[in-house]
Amino acid sequence: MTPMMHERVRNMFGDAGLTVGFTVQKLVYDDPEDLTQAVMVFRPNGGSNIRHDLGSEHHVLVDVIGAKDKRGDAANAVQHIVDYVQANPMADECVGYIQNMGAIPAPVLTAEGRIVFRLQFACTYGE
């Protein structure tokens, strides 16, 4: 079975070293109950119609959730991710062409004081 696109993006980011220092999760945020842990969550977020033998656009959300009081570290990680994708839009043949959608959004804070950036990517892929 072919991995879902959010899993392929997770693998691409991991291979590029972009997830170092983060607990990596899929689909939904699962609180690690340790405010010193930063978390990165990969999940699908729709896209275009998926047709056989045609390219399709898959949208992937990547939530970058910083450790408590480590806002600068989370912001730096977000910038590294965006810079990497911009410089390497075709780094992984399993992802196809990836691009950031909407640049870097305004962060939000959780009740615990964690900063959260929600990045969205469009992956154009077809076989």
What are these regions (language model features)?
Residues 57-66:
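Active-site-adjacent structural patch at catalytic or cofactor/ligand-binding sites
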